[in-house]
Amino acid sequence: MKLTVCEFPDKRSRREAAWKELIQFLHAAPTDVVVLPEMPFSEWNIFTSETVDLNNWRRALADHQDMLPRFSELDARIVLSSRPVEETGKRLNQAFCWTRENGYQPVRSKYYLPDEPEGRETTWFARGDRHFTPITIAELSVGFQVCSELLFTDASHEIGRAGAHLIAAPRATGGHRRWRLAASLAAIMSGCFVASANRRSEDSKAFAGCRSVVSPEGEVLAETDLASPYVTVEIDLEDAMRAKRTYPRNLTI
């Protein structure tokens, strides 16, 4: 199975050009699965406000809704990411799966919400799902750990015990080494491949890009960088199944 991770610009003004570049990249080398960053079609700075600006919120909803029909422009079977939604009066950061056959499918909403100057997520979002149940898409089983959730290895372990092949980790973060370490530890604890996708800032260090695909043993298989914002690797789903039977995944709990 071919798996692609992407950097995506934070600036709204650069988004259309980046989308067209991604279309061209996948046209030249089609893939099975694309992982995009966390809420990729909104500028993140709106979520740093300590009060909710409803105009900005509605714009974020519209920006993501408008992009859903455009996923079919990508030479990919599956798109994994998250987006802002409003359901039953709650604002949520909803992980989702899009497939060429069945369109949009919600999976779960982000549970671990930071309250930091870089993101006042407890202000903007309600807590979502405490459990991390994977979704099955044809031959692929995938669980989501959205951004800060990747730091919680109990969630990784839960996803692995449920038999998943892949953890999708859409993110919006800086370049602290914790993120690379977290992706590797999530893979080791779950026996899953981990695909992490991040934003990149052009005029600051707020978002570092540099995202990766990690093997079930925690080895980095490929990483993006400024010159190569998209990277595709071939993975064998059976590697994830074999990893479940080995240390430390086979420990009794």
Residue ranges, per PLM feature:
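Active-site catalytic loop in hydrolytic enzyme cores
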Residues: 87-162, 179, 242-252
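Hydrophobic residues at beta-strand termini and immediately following loops
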Residues: 6, 108, 135, 197, ...
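N-terminal phosphate-binding loop and adjacent alpha-helix
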Residues: 6-24
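Active-site-proximal beta-strand elements of phosphoester/diester hydrolases
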Residues: 1-12, 35, 94, 107, ...
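Short, flexible loop segments at the rims of nucleotide/cofactor-binding pockets, characterized by
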Residues: 9-14, 56-61, 120-124, 143-148, ...
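CN hydrolase (nitrilase-like) catalytic-core segments centered on the catalytic cysteine
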Residues: 60-78, 150-230
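Cys-nucleophile CN-hydrolase/nitrilase-fold catalytic domain and related Cys-dependent amidase chemistry
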Residues: 20-101, 176-189
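Short beta-strand scaffold segments in enzyme catalytic cores
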Residues: 82-83, 93-98, 133-135, 196, ...
